[in-house]
């Protein structure tokens, strides 16, 4: 059936939970593109035959195939665009370094796009807030307090706070640290926020 593979790509993303990135379906995308190429070539030969032999009975078939081509294109673009939106959201959630489990699900082109996006975002953040720039990925929601209690989930090593003091982050140790310095480590799974 026409457009079935393209619809399966869209269904695959629809079934994936929000915030998760399923593996890039290169095989499915290739099959859709091959179907589109075959439809286009069939249309070209039928149009040429309709012109040369005056066969008007081929026009409805050509229109049908053209509609299938447009639907395949829409589904393919929707699949790729939704993946880019999810990858962009991952930058805000995990920071500039994605876990290997997520990078494994990305195509080479998506990895390249992610790298360009994070560089553009970093350039923009450096242009804000004077000499040091402003990290707009921190405090996505307004904080209730400036300091929070955190527990270290794995050995991390030395962690320097703004006032110059260093804190040794060892597994199961608890600390009272500035929220904005901890949020990145919380998202990476190094720290967890201890709710009293």
Curated annotation (Swiss-Prot):
Q: Single Gene Ontology BP term? A: inner cell mass cell proliferation
Q: Where are the transmembrane segments?
A: none
For this UniProt entry, what is the primary localization, expressed as one broad class?
Answer: nucleus
Q: Which Pfam families match?
A: PSF1_C (PF24997), Sld5 (PF05916)
Compartments annotated for it: namely: Nucleus; Chromosome
Concerning Gene3D superfamilies, the annotation shows: 1.20.58.1030
Classify the source by domain of life. Eukaryota
Q: Which SUPFAM superfamilies match?
A: GINS helical bundle-like
**Keywords annotated in UniProt:** Chromosome, DNA replication, Nucleus
One Gene Ontology CC term in the entry: CMG complex
Similarity comment: Belongs to the GINS1/PSF1 family.
Q: How does it assemble?
A: Component of the GINS complex which is a heterotetramer of GINS1, GINS2, GINS3 and GINS4. Forms a stable subcomplex with GINS4. GINS complex interacts with DNA primase in vitro. Component of the CMG helicase complex, a hexameric ring of related MCM2-7 subunits stabilized by CDC45 and the tetrameric GINS complex.
Q: Give the protein's biological function.
A: Required for correct functioning of the GINS complex, a complex that plays an essential role in the initiation of DNA replication, and progression of DNA replication forks. GINS complex is a core component of CDC45-MCM-GINS (CMG) helicase, the molecular machine that unwinds template DNA during replication, and around which the replisome is built.
Stated name of the protein: DNA replication complex GINS protein PSF1
User: What is the organism of origin for this protein?
Assistant: Mus musculus
What's the encoding gene here? Gins1
């Amino acid at each position: 059936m026409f457009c079935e593979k393209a619809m399966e790509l869209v269904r695959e993303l629809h079934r994936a939970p929000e915030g998760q990135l399923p593996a890039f379906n290169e095989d499915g995308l290739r099959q859709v593109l091959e179907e589109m190429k075959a439809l286009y070539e069939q249309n070209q030969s039928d149009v040429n035959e309709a012109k040369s032999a005056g066969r008007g009975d081929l026009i409805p078939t050509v229109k049908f195939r053209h509609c299938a081509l447009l639907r395949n294109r829409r589904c393919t673009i929707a699949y790729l665009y939704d993946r880019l939106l999810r990858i962009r959201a991952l930058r805000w959630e995990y920071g500039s370094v994605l876990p290997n489990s997520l990078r494994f699900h990305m195509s080479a082109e998506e990895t390249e796009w992610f790298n360009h996006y994070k560089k553009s975002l970093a350039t923009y953040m450096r242009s804000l807030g004077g000499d040091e720039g402003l990290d707009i990925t921190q405090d996505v929601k307004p904080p209730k307090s400036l300091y929070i209690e955190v527990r270290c989930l794995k050995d991390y090593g030395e962690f320097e706070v703004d006032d110059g003091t260093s804190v040794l982050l060892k597994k199961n140790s608890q600390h009272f640290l500035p929220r904005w310095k901890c949020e990145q480590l919380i998202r990476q799974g190094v720290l967890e926020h201890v709710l009293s």
